[in-house]
Regions:
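Single conserved hydrophobic/aromatic residue that forms the stacking wall/gate
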Residues: 1-8, 12
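Conserved donor-binding/catalytic loop of nucleotide-activated donor transferases
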Residues: 7, 23-25, 45-46
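Glycine-rich phosphate-binding loop at the start of an alpha helix
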Residues: 10, 14, 37, 67, ...
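CoA-thioester-processing core
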Residues: 16, 20, 30, 36-86, ...
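Terminal peptide-recognition signature
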Residues: 26, 43, 97, 135
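Well-ordered beta-strand positions
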Residues: 47-48, 84, 88-90, 96, ...
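C-terminal long alpha-helix characteristic of the crotonase
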Residues: 50-55, 103-151
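Short alpha-helical scaffolding segments that buttress acidic/His motifs in well-ordered protein cores
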Residues: 85-89, 135-139, 154, 158
Length: 167
């Protein structure tokens, strides 16, 4: 039998991720410390990502037979790095993600990161709201992969894999 609490949790994660990604309002994500597993979906679904220097990123799902995350991760790092991260479950430094352009800026502490986030938010809020909405739609439609569809497929394949492993 399928673990319904796990299935419900995965549906919720997908809904949250989709809500962030599909929001009409640009989402700025601030990362401080561990960005692991399901927590990785937040920056991967956001429009702008900031982080402190003590942050690191990890997709350890392979260690638990959870096979999701690659679609979203592709928004922060190139496809070969996605493969390495999801196949090994190893952690990656904030500097590494920054070198690929997945993080806009690295900050010494939370305070300076939040100041930058507020500066960016004020600048975006000063723009014409309807133009921002249209631009968000354009940016999302320019994605090479439909992360919403891919995430759902990853979850379905994970459930099937877990079922096969338990049989």
């Amino acid at each position: 039998p399928q673990d319904t609490s796990s299935a419900a949790s995965d549906v919720y994660k997908r809904q949250v991720s989709n809500a962030i990604y599909n929001s009409d309002i640009p989402v700025i994500c601030c990362c401080d410390g561990f960005v692991i597993g399901a927590g990785f979906f937040l920056p991967c679904s956001s429009d702008i990502v900031l982080a402190t220097k003590n942050s690191y990123f990890q997709m350890p799902g392979i260690n638990f037979d959870v096979l999701v995350g690659s679609a979203h991760l592709g928004r922060l790092v190139p496809k070969q790095k996605v493969r390495e991260m999801v196949l090994t479950g190893e952690k990656v430094s904030v500097e590494h993600i920054f070198s690929y352009g997945g993080i806009s800026s690295i900050h010494d502490n939370k305070e300076s990161m939040m100041l930058r986030a507020n500066e960016l938010a004020k600048k975006i809020c000063s723009m014409e709201r309807d133009s921002i909405k249209v631009l968000k739609k354009i940016l999302n439609s320019n994605e090479v992969i439909d992360v919403n569809r891919a995430f759902k497929q990853e979850q379905q394949l994970t459930f099937q894999n877990k079922k096969n492993l338990s049989d």
